[in-house]
């Protein structure tokens, strides 16, 4: 696997385990500022992008969010049977509190929460109408395996929507290094 330094911070295949452990620790440390940093890194477009992704869900659908983080997207999606998946127990703890509070205020049932990586989703085949992956695909350990798992849990005719700012240039690479410092 090419190193992130050799590709300007971008690795199309994923990240290795050592890099992942460092990233997970940094992400957990960023929880108090996660939304603010995401807004800055996307020049304020993150809310618009999340809204556009939400429009792909229809009432009554079974929806899985892979890499839910602290629940920034999941708290605003309504009328669906929602499952939030993230490898970080700390992110899931924050997401559960945040998302279930929002769902409760709308009279909706709590979401389900699963601690797992995208490359090993412990959910049944052909379960979800939509799978959303916002701002986390770039951090998959193995993108190909993650996509295989997502496609496995999607129902036939279901849709995967990925929304990610990426790290494909020096600016995003620099921004990511500043954020994670």
Residue ranges and their predicted role:
Residues 1-32:
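N-terminal, positively charged/glycine-rich alpha-helical extensions of SAM-dependent methyltransferases
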Residues 119-131:
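A short acidic, Gly/Pro-enriched loop at the edge of an enzyme's catalytic core
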Residues 64-120:
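Class I SAM-dependent methyltransferase SAM/SAH-binding core
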Residues 62, 158-159:
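Short glycine-centered segments of the SAM/dcSAM-binding site in methyltransferase folds
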Residues 130-142:
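A short SAM/SAH-binding and catalytic strip from SAM-dependent methyltransferases
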Residues 161-181:
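Conserved class I S-adenosyl-L-methionine
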Residues 42-60:
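Conserved alpha-helix/loop element of class I SAM-dependent methyltransferases that forms part
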Residues 144-156:
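A short glycine-rich, Lys/Arg-flanked "PGG" loop and its adjoining helix->strand segment in the class I
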């Amino acid at each position: 696997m090419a190193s992130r330094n050799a590709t300007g911070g971008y690795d199309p295949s994923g990240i290795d385990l050592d890099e992942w452990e460092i990233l997970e620790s940094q992400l957990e440390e960023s929880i108090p500022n996660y939304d603010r940093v995401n807004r800055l890194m996307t020049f304020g477009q993150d809310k618009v992008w999340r809204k556009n992704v939400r429009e792909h869900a229809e009432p009554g659908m079974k929806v899985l969010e892979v890499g839910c983080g602290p629940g920034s997207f999941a708290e605003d999606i309504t009328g669906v049977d929602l499952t939030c998946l993230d490898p970080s127990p700390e992110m899931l703890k924050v997401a559960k509190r945040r998302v279930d509070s929002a769902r409760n205020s709308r009279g909706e049932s709590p979401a389900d929460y699963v601690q797992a990586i995208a490359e090993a989703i412990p959910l049944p085949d052909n379960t979800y109408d939509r799978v959303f992956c916002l701002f986390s695909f770039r951090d998959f350990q193995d993108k190909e395996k993650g996509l295989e798992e997502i496609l496995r849990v999607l129902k036939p005719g279901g849709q995967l929507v990925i929304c990610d700012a990426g790290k494909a240039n020096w600016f995003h690479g620099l921004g990511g290094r500043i954020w994670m410092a």
